From Swiss-Prot:
Record domain Lon N-terminal: where: 13-222
UniProt name for this protein: Lon protease homolog 2, peroxisomal
Organism: Mus musculus
Catalytic residues of the enzyme: 743, 786
Subunit and partners: Interacts with PEX5. Interacts with TYSND1. May interact with enzymes involved in beta-oxidation of fatty acids, including ACOX1/AOX.
Keyword annotations from UniProtKB, A to Z: Acetylation, ATP-binding, Hydrolase, Nucleotide-binding, Peroxisome, Protease, Serine protease
Cited HAMAP family: lonp2_euk (MF_03121)
Family: Belongs to the peptidase S16 family.
NCBIfam families in UniProt: lon (TIGR00763)
Binding of ATP, residues: 375-382
Pfam families given in the database record: AAA, Lon_C, Lon_lid, LON_substr_bdg
Subcellular compartments: Peroxisome matrix
């Protein structure tokens, strides 16, 4: 047995103050440093740049360091441990701190504190004896007997540990090689002891006292291990398993305690799981995987982290609806009535749902279609999906995809990762409990993309009827049949949907509502819903249709009805205040009547409170019911109108025309303004325009320059070269909104023609269409939304490309009756329709028509 090599520490040591841990000589401890003095000590004495200094510290236990260095030091513990920092790791979260790995060297005693700031420094005296231990044992028999007794208990403890034979032999060699005088400190830091017991061992300067205090701790640990071995069930692989070197860090339990009851419950749960696996209707491949996992679970200790993961996996497998489904309601007549009651208009969408029901009647094993409702916000795309599920009698589940940027949200995480879980598809199936629900994939056009993968690519398999019968979630790692699920996606635009994903879905356009449709929706659905939410009845409030029309035209500007619904909510809140005040006034009037009757017999005291008299005098009658919401009440509640019809005012001078634009929020009218000035022939474009729109402007000016003589268009100097010493500025108002697309071509031509001819464009005309350099008008998209926007703005005539005439069939008949349409195949027809009296070709005087 070797002896301790002499350790000599400096007489002055910087002090590291710890509170919740005790460091013993020969042991290693990890501690966190976050107080002012300790941080200053680490930065000044341990760290030099990025390197670690070999500085001996004095670790003082059971002494909290004040949070501020302005506070005085608390009383210091008398005995500490000289230590060497092995590792220092810094961090700034949640606050600046260091984590130190320190090794104890020897004991010392504080003689005098030399300074307290910026960190404490003390004069110390080393306490551990440096004499050779064998020489001490020869001179003192009691110390030698204690040493031998301690060694025997230490060997017995090592042999009782649940470790392999080689590991036990290695620990035996370690005990033999360690100095005997170091064993009490080292084993005390390893076995289960409290900080109070460790502090007592630290204070035991004498070796005899140290051995005497440590032996009972070893005996207690040995008895606990014996009790644990009696209560444990023997296993075949006990001799092969290896646990951590630190022995038994938990209190041994007694038979019949809560731990035994929990173990019995776990065993019962495993039996139930095994029974569910045998009786489940899962496919053969999934059944094989579950049987294999349940066998692993039986052999696995409950303390292993993988035990809970495997159990959760098996519980999910038996809960999934592999073959459980609901029966569809295929009554087309009842479905039509239900859809009409829930939603007004949307004829195209309702027809597609009824077609699906009809085909399901003829073919039971029809694969679910993949529908995608595309339209502006607030038109009812999400609520239609819920109505479809209600019509079919199926379960409904909504999956919000807006902002999802991790493909694991769709496919799940592999079970090798910590915190793994299935994807949203499998989770949704577990939630609804059937394999043929209606899944609403909301906002599919707002999927993101990140380093974790592309969720839109993960949806390709889900939304492909030819592949989704074999969908494999990463967490399950077995195939699940999604062919019976009816997937409905919603989007505001198809522009941001990847082409491969768009190709897998059947696009159904859901356009915005007309004013008449909004009025019907308001009085059928919105107003009754708001009355119910605010506790009102139709006998208390009356909103005529002309008031609803005023709200639609002057307080909202949208394709859907969300803002309209909020306006009705504001009206109902204002009426609720009036109704509540009226009930309060009625009660006060009743009380005042009673007081007046009694006042005939009594005199009013002079010191009566004036508030009660004035309150009674100022009482007003409650409002008459029902409260009528007219234009005056509308202005009081909602304030001044937000939108005004300013079309005629803005077209009061040449160089202004009205175009029609399409946005994901629906159609809208767009003004185009032009002005000319002396310059060098430059064309300036403003209004946040895209490249396509800029090219349309250059096309328009080129066509007008080439046809200037034909229409007798001149600049301010009378020249047919429109850009000769002239600059042109084209502006598209709402400059904060980005604009792009080819459909503004005809509007730009009309605006510039008005500028150079000095004629006004008709104030009731709007137009849309793409142009070519030869003056042709090409078709554009979004005709229905654009026409509805023009109708909302009060325009009367719409100029559209001739090849878009077929799109007029989708426009409601009442809108078509209010508007007149001009279909144009070339710019000549556009100009003739945009100006009063047409835009005739100017013939050059003095020319004689040849008859040859």
């Amino acid at each position: 047995m070797s002896s301790v090599s002499p350790i000599q520490i400096p007489s002055r040591l910087p002090l590291l103050l710890t509170h919740e841990s005790v460091l013993l000589p020969g042991s290693t401890m990890r501690t966190s440093v976050d107080t002012a003095r300790n941080l200053q000590l680490v930065r000044s004495r341990l760290l030099k740049g990025t390197s670690l200094q070999s500085t001996i510290l004095g670790v003082i236990p059971n002494t909290p360091d004040p949070a501020s260095d302005t506070q005085d030091l608390p009383p210091l513990h008398r005995i500490g441990t000289a230590a060497l920092a092995v590792q220092v790791v810094g961090s700034n979260w949640p606050k600046p701190h260091y984590t130190l790995l320190i090794t104890g060297l020897c004991r010392f005693q504080i003689v005098q504190v030399l300074k307290e700031k910026p960190y404490p420094v003390a004069e110390v005296e080393q306490l551990d004896r440096l004499e050779e231990f064998p020489n001490i044992c020869k001179s003192r028999e009691e110390l030698g007997e204690l040493s031998e007794q301690f060694y025997r208990y230490a060997v017995q403890l090592v042999e009782m540990l649940d470790m392999s034979v080689p590991a036990v032999a290695k620990l035996r060699r370690l005990l033999d090689n360690l100095p005997r005088e170091a064993l009490p400190d080292i084993l005390t830091s390893i076995i289960r002891t409290s900080n109070k017991e460790k502090l007592q061992i630290l204070d035991a300067v004498s070796l005899e006292d140290r051995f005497k205090m440590t032996i009972p701790l070893l005996v207690r640990q040995i008895e606990g291990l014996k009790l644990l071995q009696k209560t444990r069930k023997p296993k075949q692989d006990d001799d092969k398993r290896v646990i951590a070197i630190r022995p038994i860090r938990r209190i041994p339990h007694i038979p019949g305690t809560l731990e035994d009851e929990e173990e019995e419950e776990d065993n019962d749960d495993i039996v139930m799981l095994e029974k569910k696996i045998r009786t489940s209707s899962m496919p053969e491949q999934a059944h094989k995987v579950c049987v294999k996992e349940i066998k692993r679970l039986k052999k696995m200790p409950q303390s292993m982290p993988e035990y809970a993961l495997t159990r959760n996996y098996l519980e999910l497998m038996v809960e999934l609806p592999w073959n459980k489904s609901t029966t569809d309601r295929l009554d087309i007549r009842a479905a039509r009535i239900l859809l009409d009651n829930d939603h007004y208009a949307m004829e195209k969408l309702k027809r597609r749902v009824l077609e699906y029901l009809a085909v399901r009647q003829l073919k039971n094993n029809l694969k679910g279609p993949i529908l995608c409702f595309v339209g502006p916000p607030g038109v009812g795309k999400t609520s239609v999906g819920r109505s479809v599920a209600k019509t079919l009698g199926r379960e409904f589940h909504r999956i919000a995809l807006g902002g999802v940027c991790d493909q694991s949200d769709i496919r799940g995480h592999r079970r090798t990762y910590v915190g793994s879980m299935p994807g949203r598809i499998i989770n949704g199936l577990k939630t609804v409990g059937v394999n043929n629900p209606v899944f609403l994939l909301d906002e599919v056009d707002k999927l993101g993309k990140s380093l974790q993968g592309d969720p839109a690519a993960a949806l390709l398999e889900v939304l492909d009827p030819e592949q989704n019968h074999n969908f494999t979630d990463h967490y399950l790692n077995v195939a699940f049949d999604l062919s019976q699920v009816l997937f409905i996606a919603t989007a505001n635009t198809t522009a941001t949907i990847p082409p491969a994903l768009l190709d897998r879905m059947e696009i159904i356009q859901v356009p915005g509502y007309t004013q008449e449709e909004k009025i019907e929706i308001a009085h059928r659905h919105l107003i009754p819903k708001q009355l119910e939410q605010h506790g009102l009845t139709p006998q208390q409030i009356q909103i005529p249709q002309h008031t609803t029309l005023a709200i639609i035209t002057r307080y909202t500007r949208e394709a859907g009805v969300r803002s309209l619904d909020r306006k009705f909510g504001a009206i109902c809140r204002a009426v609720a205040v009036k109704v509540a005040e009226g009930q309060h006034k009625e009660a006060k009037l009743d009380r005042s009547d009673v007081a007046d009757g009694e006042g005939c017999k009594e005199h009013v005291l002079e010191d009566a409170k004036p508030e009660s008299i004035s309150d009674t005098a100022d009482l007003a009658l409650p409002p008459e019911m029902p409260i009528l919401i007219d234009s005056h009440a509308l202005k009081d509640i909602l304030g001044p109108p937000l939108y005004e019809l300013e079309v005629s005012e803005r077209l009061s001078q040449p160089g202004v025309a009205i175009g029609l634009a399409w946005t994901p929020l629906g159609g809208k009218i767009m003004f185009v303004e032009a002005s000319r000035m002396d310059g060098e022939g430059q064309l300036t474009l403003t209004g946040q325009l895209g490249d396509v729109m800029k090219e349309s402007a250059h096309l328009a000016i080129s066509w007008l320059r080439s046809n200037a003589k034909k229409y007798h268009l001149t600049n301010a100097f009378g020249s047919f070269d429109l850009l000769d010493n002239t600059d042109i500025h084209l502006h598209f108002p709402a400059g904060a909104v980005t604009k792009d697309g080819p459909s503004a071509g005809v509007t730009i031509v009309t605006c510039l023609a008005s500028l150079f001819s000095g004629r006004l464009v008709r104030s009731d005309v709007a137009m849309t269409g793409e142009i070519t350099l030869r003056g042709l008008v090409l078709p554009v998209g979004g005709i229905k939304d654009k026409v509805l926007a023009a109708h909302r703005a009060g325009l009367k005539q719409i100029i559209i490309p001739q090849r878009n005439e077929k799109d007029l069939e989708e426009i409601p008949s009442n809108v078509r009756q209010d508007l007149s349409f001009v279909t144009a195949s070339c710019l000549d027809e556009v100009l003739n329709a945009a100006f009063d009296g047409g835009f005739p070709v100017k013939t050059r005087p003095g020319l004689i028509d040849s008859k040859l």
